[in-house]
A protein has these predicted regions:
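A beta-strand/beta-hairpin structural motif
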Residues: 84-90
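Hot-dog-fold acyl-thioester-processing enzymes
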Residues: 1-84
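HotDog/MaoC-like acyl-thioester-processing domains
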Residues: 1-2, 6, 91-145
Length: 145
């Protein structure tokens, strides 16, 4: 069982530079076809300063850390014990190439199902750009067996 006293635990902020290459690779990998993710001219024509990141692009930010699964170790969860159950983003401003994103996360909730056989961890993250503008918030739910 995961210690409920860990609810509210925060993690050190992490910074990620959004580049044209990262956007193009992610857009290609996720089957995007809109040219605003590939061609600067198309993005600018639509009013963006540079390539626009696809909506789920921010998922990749946490995986750029030196140890992206450190939070699992902190909670004594082995990699094979959990599944990603849900992810929800709320966007406030576009994320574009040239942005520097700061990600701040915390464990916001922990609850059980099936008599405690399954534990659900809810992480909330805030993504802020170089201008200190909150561009998005996310809620990620993991299930641990």
């Amino acid at each position: 069982m995961i210690d409920r006293s860990l609810i509210g635990k925060t993690y050190p902020p992490f910074y990620s530079d959004v580049t044209e290459e990262k956007i193009r690779l992610f857009a290609k990998a996720t089957g995007q076809t809109n040219p605003i993710h590939f061609l600067i001219e198309s993005a600018k024509k639509e009013g963006y300063p540079s390539l626009l990141a696809p909506l789920t692009f921010l998922t990749t930010v946490s995986y750029e850390q030196e140890d992206p699964y450190k939070y699992l170790k902190d909670l004594n969860i082995e990699l094979g014990q959990f599944l990603h159950a849900n992810q929800k983003y709320t966007y406030f401003s576009p994320v574009c190439a040239g942005d520097r994103i700061k990600m701040e996360s915390k464990l916001s909730d922990l609850f059980d199902k099936r008599g405690g056989r399954l534990q659900f961890l809810v992480f909330r993250s805030t993504y802020t750009n170089q201008d200190k503008v909150i561009v998005a918030k996310s809620k990620s739910t993991l299930v641990v067996r």
